[in-house]
Design a protein with these regions (language model features):
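Catalytic machinery of carbohydrate-active enzymes
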Residues: 1-335
Length: 335
């Protein structure tokens, strides 16, 4: 069987969709699985174990000058790449026109199909015109966790919904080049403070207070950043917190994942890096400043927890949660 995953963006959603790959291999051990994803995320997706091909697409970049000669040539080259193989199943995990447009361009084997969501789910992006582009609409619950939604879409599209597999926690599997557990004695905590949504942010004063608590407990801090505003923020923090706070350079997502995987864990807001912490199997506290933990928070792991909800958590709640996950991690995965 040959299966194509179409999940283009964004970072957190792409990472959560990775849980589908082990499910597919459990049900179809000989399946060849390809993935179409935005070019910025392709190096990270290439680290997922069990993929045959990763097909990068430049939709975000193309939109800036859609009719330029260069972008027209790139789109034609991508179309040729997409047409190289025929698929038994093409599954659009995005449910948007931009992703259905990609899925609709694929070649199918005899009896092959193209599937996506048949309806919207709460707090999930969805565009109804996908019905006009693809041929199999899969009904979904009105309220469901994002990871469960991706896994259920694959299961219903490929007729294994009744398998006990879906009752088990999501799994993420990485190639050997992506470390899977903190290094022995790791003392560096990653503060994943960045987010594209202002309503997801946690107060800077609380981050600084938490940083001091971690340093007082003998930990170092890693400060990743993306963009000028986040870089200015971590520069301020490093000046206040001192040499124990390391500003990480901007780096590719695959390299960043390897650096995170060698840390003692991650404390972060609802963002792509927090979802990456979950997928890497790290001790993790995820901070929510709105009622979204039911949809996006970590599940099924004692050393990965969500704090907050309709209101942001206090710094003490985050600190207590961090101590909790450290204890749970030591019990479940002793050195």
């Amino acid at each position: 069987m040959r299966i194509l995953i179409v999940k283009l963006s964004s970072l957190g959603d792409v990472i959560q969709t990775m849980a589908v790959v082990p499910d597919l291999h459990a049900m179809f051990p000989d399946a060849q699985i390809d993935w179409v994803v935005e070019e910025a995320f392709a190096p990270l997706v290439a680290q997922v174990q069990g993929l045959a091909r990763v097909l990068p697409i430049g939709q975000r970049r193309w939109r800036k000058a859609y009719f330029s000669a260069t972008h027209r040539a790139e789109r034609a080259a991508f179309h040729r790449l997409l047409q190289q193989d025929a698929y038994d199943a093409v599954i659009d995990f995005q449910g948007l026109i931009k992703s259905a447009w990609v899925a609709a361009q694929t070649r199918l084997r005899p009896l092959g199909f193209r599937a996506t969501y048949g309806n919207a789910s709460q707090a999930c992006a969805y565009e109804w015109p996908v019905h006009l582009l693809l041929d199999r609409m899969v009904p979904m619950p009105a309220r469901i966790h994002a990871v469960a939604r991706y896994r259920l879409l694959a299961a219903r599209a490929l007729n294994y919904e009744q398998a006990s597999l879906l009752a088990k926690p999501a799994q993420y599997r990485w190639e050997a080049s992506a470390a899977m557990a903190p290094a022995s004695g790791a003392r560096l905590v990653v503060l994943a403070h960045g987010t594209t949504r202002p309503d997801n942010e946690w107060l800077e004063a609380d981050w600084l207070a938490l940083g001091r608590q971690l340093i007082d407990a003998g930990m170092g801090l890693a400060l990743p950043h993306a963009g000028a505003a986040e870089f200015a923020r971590v520069q301020r923090w490093a000046q206040v917190l001192g040499p124990q706070a390391q500003i990480w350079p901007q780096q590719g997502l695959d390299t960043l994942a390897q650096a995170m995987a060698a840390s003692a864990g991650v404390i972060g807001v609802d963002s792509g890096l927090s979802h990456l912490a979950v997928a890497l199997g790290l001790p993790h506290v995820q901070i929510f400043s709105q009622d979204r933990a039911w949809r996006a928070g970590p599940q099924g792991c004692t050393y990965q927890v969500a704090v907050g909800g309709a209101q942001a958590p206090t710094r003490e709640q985050v600190w207590q949660a961090w101590q909790q996950v450290q204890t749970a991690y030591a019990q479940e995965r002793p050195a």
